[in-house]
Amino acid sequence: MSPKEEESTIRNYSHSFVDRKGEAILIKKLDDSMHQALIKKYLAYQPRDSFEGLPPIEDEACVKWVWKMIRDGTNLVALASEGDIVGHTAIFFIDRQRCEMLTVVWPQFQSRGIGTELVRSSIHLAHEMGFEKVWLSVDAANLRARHIYKECGFECLSSGDRGDVEMALDLKGQHEEEQ
């Protein structure tokens, strides 16, 4: 795929599905018109500081953090049928082979399959972008997220019941299958 085709694929990415409660959910690339809505969602997120110190507790720090994700990442949002953001995932460049992934589903929309679809969408985009490995860090106590990541093929690089657990997904096999 040429860089132009790759960018077009990423820019136009969208995926819709029906969640476990029967609601239509659209996952699409974050566009300029949604930046303020994403910031407002993170400012309203409760409890703040609930996953690895994120979102930041102080409003100013939270806004800066969201802008950094918008600027530095490839961002997807999950939208409910009325257009409200119910989840967010981002891929961040580490180096030519590796990227980092962050995924958040707002608490009232958890356990509906949205997180799993966001993770799968990020994996798809990371693959399309040519990355060989997706890395993430998750709070050891966040068993729901750890289950989703394992279900999507991630393997634990570290373990424990306290602190953070590092996980990674090797995409190299997927690249070789295409050739």
PLM features: what roles do these ranges have?
Residues 43-102, 106:
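Acetyl-CoA-dependent GNAT
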